[in-house]
């Protein structure tokens, strides 16, 4: 037998959870750098377990296993006891305890936490995308986006982009301004990936005045004038009509309400369904 301690990490998924716990525990034993881990991932049958125990036969081993399959975990326990291996079952007692108290049966599916982690990183990627391409900073992002939101100023484009990015959707928003040509990329993508936003003239007049005031500017500036708002609104509606994209009037709608409408449109059109 080797004197060096080897910690066997046995999992029906990657084994990252068990390894993290093992590392936390070993930090309480400084000076034992010769102890090391050996990880066995995707152990989902008794045959695979037997291969692990065969490899353990010539080593000083401490077994740590995270197996959501109750029968497989029970088999691993019995094998450890019959071979006199020290072991700890990381999941069974906790899962059974929660199930007993809550009255809810566990899913029994390995790798769920890892899938949740993947979802988290996808969400972060989508949020970073929305920030990078906010307010039409780089129209080339249109070709990479799951969704393109277009509209004139103060139609909730940015907050909607961020809200939808949190749903794992890569969103770019493009401001429509009469003096600025429409990005050519808008005509290179499926119009079902584009959502146009409009607002009532009166509401736009009010929110733009508030915006000007917050910037320390006069509320009588052209930006908030009814004539300018009407000009922009007509221009935007013409662009949206030519593109053939769905149009949503966001007047008196909360961000969440508009986002729900957008998600339903995307689902109906079969767009970015993988993210929803």
Curated annotation (Swiss-Prot):
InterPro entries: Kinase-pyrophosphorylase, PPDK_reg. ADP binds at residues 151-158. It catalyses: N(tele)-phospho-L-histidyl/L-threonyl-[pyruvate, phosphate dikinase] + ADP = N(tele)-phospho-L-histidyl/O-phospho-L-threonyl-[pyruvate, phosphate dikinase] + AMP + H(+); N(tele)-phospho-L-histidyl/O-phospho-L-threonyl-[pyruvate, phosphate dikinase] + phosphate + H(+) = N(tele)-phospho-L-histidyl/L-threonyl-[pyruvate, phosphate dikinase] + diphosphate. It holds the Pfam family Kinase-PPPase. One of its GO terms (molecular function) is protein serine/threonine kinase activity. Signal peptide: none annotated. Keywords: Kinase, Nucleotide-binding, Serine/threonine-protein kinase, Transferase. It comes from the Bacteria. Its EC number is 2.7.11.32, 2.7.4.27. Bifunctional serine/threonine kinase and phosphorylase involved in the regulation of the pyruvate, phosphate dikinase (PPDK) by catalyzing its phosphorylation/dephosphorylation. NCBIfam families: PRK05339.1. PANTHER family: PYRUVATE, PHOSPHATE DIKINASE REGULATORY PROTEIN 1, CHLOROPLASTIC (PTHR31756:SF3). Belongs to the pyruvate, phosphate/water dikinase regulatory protein family. PDRP subfamily. This is Putative pyruvate, phosphate dikinase regulatory protein.
């Amino acid at each position: 037998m080797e004197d060096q301690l080897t910690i066997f990490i046995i999992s029906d998924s990657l084994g990252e959870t068990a390894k993290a716990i093992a590392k936390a525990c070993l930090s309480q034993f400084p000076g034992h750098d010769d102890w090391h881990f050996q990880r066995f991932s995707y152990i989902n049958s008794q045959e695979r377990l037997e291969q692990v125990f065969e490899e353990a036969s010539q080593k000083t081993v401490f077994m740590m296993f995270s197996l959501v399959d109750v029968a497989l975990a029970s088999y691993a326990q019995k094998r450890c006891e019959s071979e006199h291996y020290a072991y700890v079952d990381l999941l069974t007692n906790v899962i059974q305890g929660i199930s007993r108290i809550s009255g809810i049966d566990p899913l029994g599916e390995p790798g769920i936490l890892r899938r949740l982690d993947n979802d988290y990183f996808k969400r972060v990627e989508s949020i970073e995308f929305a920030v990078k391409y906010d307010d039409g900073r780089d129209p080339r992002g249109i070709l990479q986006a799951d969704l393109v939101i277009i509209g004139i100023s103060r139609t909730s484009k940015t907050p909607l982009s961020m809200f939808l990015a949190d749903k794992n959707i890569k969103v770019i928003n493009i401001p429509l301004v009469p003096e600025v040509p429409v990005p050519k990329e808008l005509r290179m993508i499926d119009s079902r990936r584009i959502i146009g936003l409009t607002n009532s003239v009166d509401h736009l007049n009010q929110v733009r005045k508030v915006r000007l005031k917050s910037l320390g500017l006069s509320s009588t500036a052209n930006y908030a004038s009814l004539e300018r708002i009407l000009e922009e609104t007509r221009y935007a509606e013409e662009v949206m009509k030519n593109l053939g994209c769905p149009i949503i009037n966001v007047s008196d709608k909360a961000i969440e309400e508009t986002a729900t409408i957008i998600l339903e449109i995307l689902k109906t059109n079969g767009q970015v369904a993988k993210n929803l």
